[in-house]
Amino acid sequence: MGNLKQRLIKPGTDFNYAEGVKVKNASSSTISANKIVYVSGYEGPFLKVNLADASSDNTCSGRLMIAKHDIPGDGFGVVLPWKLVTSVDTSGVTAAGDPLYLSETAGDFTATAPTLKVYVGHAITDAADGAYLFCGEGSNRAV
């Protein structure tokens, strides 16, 4: 078993370094940073991911994660189970703390619940240059 030294553990301010998962982009298109993804399969020891959307059960089921950085098409990158996402437009929410849902637009979130309501986090601020906390853990289906 490996030995993890305390000095190598970084504090988690907007995400936790220790929870990052190395994945393979299953598509030939780049997945941009802060886009929401779902696990679509595996290749060797790596999970394969695609952009998630609320248009079909197939593209929004299971644990959702968020891209830490741009992941090149057919390349490798890191996804996170939670992250504080800043510099995004959250002006569509009524107030800070409002729930956010997976959008029918691949990889995005929306303040208006679509037909398939998949909860992905909540707004921290309601502004054109706002922030939200992504948390794709467990069953994301809103009731």
Predicted regions located by residue number:
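Glycine-anchored, exposed beta-strand/edge motif detector
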Residues: 2-143
